[in-house]
């Protein structure tokens, strides 16, 4: 409680001191104004007296000081306003320069697009002109066609093997293929003398025979193999 009371007293003292200082300031201002008025009146009387020299009063000096302060404040405010105006002008100039760059970029893009369109149109025109020239060229006459047909007819006659190859190159139906593969034929090897059963294009089949027939086939095959080897080696006269 004692601490609280001391705090309240200190606060009240500080408040009373502040009020006293404010009152003193007001009194000093009033005194200065009175002194200034008295000095001005005395200066006027002295100026009216002959041979008196005019001395500057303290009020005049204070007023001149106040005027100088006001001038400095006005000059500082004018300088701040000029700086703000210069910054605004610089920002406006930068914005105008950026707008000018954007406009130039757009103009350049438009020019490029126009050039591309012109090139495409030129290419299309050239292609059309070339196609028309090709169509306008005269084709082969009837005489030339007859001559070429006669030359083809006068060529060599195709053999059976060539015809069979040409037929083999043609596409076959499933029925034709099945019929061709179902054919079984005996083929004799001229060098060895062996006979084989071949189905279709080249499938080799095994023939079921008796033992005696198998022996005869082996004898013929060995004889044929020997003769073929001797012919290749040049042993036969």
From Swiss-Prot:
This is ADP-ribosylation factor-like protein 6-interacting protein 4. The keyword Transcription does not apply. Residues 74-98 have a biased composition (Low complexity). GO terms for cellular component: nuclear speck; nucleolus; nucleus. InterPro entries: Nucl_RNA-splicing_assoc_SR-25. Residues 1-29, 101-126 have a biased composition (Basic residues). Interacts with ARL6. Interacts with ZCCHC17. Interacts with SRSF2. The lineage of its organism: Eukaryota, Metazoa, Chordata, Craniata, Vertebrata. It comes from Homo sapiens (Human).
């Amino acid at each position: 409680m004692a601490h609280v009371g001391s705090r309240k007293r200190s606060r009240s003292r500080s408040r009373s001191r502040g009020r006293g200082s404010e009152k003193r300031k007001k009194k000093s201002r009033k005194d200065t104004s009175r002194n200034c008025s008295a000095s001005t009146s005395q200066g006027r009387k002295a100026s009216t007296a002959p041979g008196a020299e005019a001395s500057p009063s303290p009020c005049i000096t204070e007023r001149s000081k106040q005027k100088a302060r006001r001038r400095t404040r006005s000059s500082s405010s004018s300088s701040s306003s000029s700086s703000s105006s210069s910054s605004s002008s610089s920002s406006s100039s930068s914005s105008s320069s950026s707008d000018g760059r954007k406009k130039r970029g757009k103009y350049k893009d438009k020019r490029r697009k126009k050039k591309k369109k012109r090139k495409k149109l030129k290419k299309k025109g050239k292609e059309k002109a070339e196609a028309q020239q090709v169509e306008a060229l005269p084709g082969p006459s009837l005489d030339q066609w007859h001559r070429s047909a006669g030359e083809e007819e006068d060529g060599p006659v195709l053999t059976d093997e060539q015809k069979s190859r040409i037929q083999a190159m043609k596409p076959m139906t499933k029925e034709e293929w099945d019929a061709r593969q179902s054919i079984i034929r005996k083929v004799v090897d001229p060098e060895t003398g062996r006979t084989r059963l071949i189905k279709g294009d080249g499938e080799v089949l095994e023939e079921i025979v008796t033992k005696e027939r198998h022996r005869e086939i082996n004898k013929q095959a060995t004889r044929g193999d020997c003769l073929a080897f001797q012919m290749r080696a040049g042993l036969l006269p």
